[in-house]
């Protein structure tokens, strides 16, 4: 690594960059351990598609292109738009999910043991801790993504800073 003291830049030569292999949950579509965003207009079916993919992962089924899910596992959902009882669980069941492999973040426990509203902009380390202790977790589904963004949604730096932990 070369450090340019004048500009305080940390620069690395490409020859020193270690190549890492990408592992795929769904080949060429969903990389494991990476942020993937389903984008589209409101009401176009992003949540339904995400739940269909999650269902495939819980049972080791086939993805929309016919390829088999080789990395079946568990799903963690954080949703601020859809109710688990009347929307999420019924859709997961309709898609054939093994609902015993799906969990949803509903609250956080405070220091004094009381349940409080989960605030992803402050409580994301709790998700990280959960993920590190859940070796079979294959997908963290956040819906909508703006629910984890703090600051001004119109400022790229605020959005990027909020999404960095993901």
What are the language-model segments listed below?
Residues 1-9:
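Charged, amphipathic alpha-helical linker segments immediately N-terminal to NTP-binding catalytic cores
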Residues 49, 53:
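Hydrophobic positions on the alpha1 helix immediately C-terminal to the Walker A/P-loop
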Residues 58:
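Gly/Ala-rich phosphate-binding loop of Rossmann-like dinucleotide-binding domains
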Residues 6, 21, 25-26, 42, ...:
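Conserved inter-motif catalytic segment of the P-loop NTP-binding fold
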Residues 45:
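Conserved glycine(s) of the Walker
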Residues 35:
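Walker A (P-loop) ATP-phosphate-binding motif of ABC ATPase nucleotide-binding domains
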Residues 31:
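Residues immediately N-terminal to the Walker A/P-loop in ABC ATPase nucleotide-binding domains
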Residues 38:
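Hydrophobic anchor at the beta1->P-loop junction of P-loop NTPases
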């Amino acid at each position: 690594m070369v450090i340019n003291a004048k500009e305080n830049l940390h620069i690395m030569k490409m020859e020193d960059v270690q190549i890492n292999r990408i592992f795929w949950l769904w080949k060429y579509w969903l990389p494991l351990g990476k942020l993937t965003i389903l984008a589209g207009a409101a009401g176009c079916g992003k949540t339904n598609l995400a739940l269909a993919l999650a269902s495939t992962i819980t049972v080791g089924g086939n993805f929309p292109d016919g390829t088999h899910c080789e990395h079946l596992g568990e799903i963690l959902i954080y949703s601020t738009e859809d109710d688990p009882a009347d929307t999420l669980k019924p859709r997961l069941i309709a898609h054939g999910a093994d609902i015993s492999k799906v969990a949803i973040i509903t609250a956080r426990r405070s220091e004094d043991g009381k349940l409080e509203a989960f605030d992803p902009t402050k409580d994301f380390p709790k998700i990280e801790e959960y993920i590190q202790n859940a070796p079979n977790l294959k997908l963290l589904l956040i819906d909508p993504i703006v629910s984890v963004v703090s600051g001004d949604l119109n400022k790229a730096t605020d959005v990027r800073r909020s999404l960095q932990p993901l």
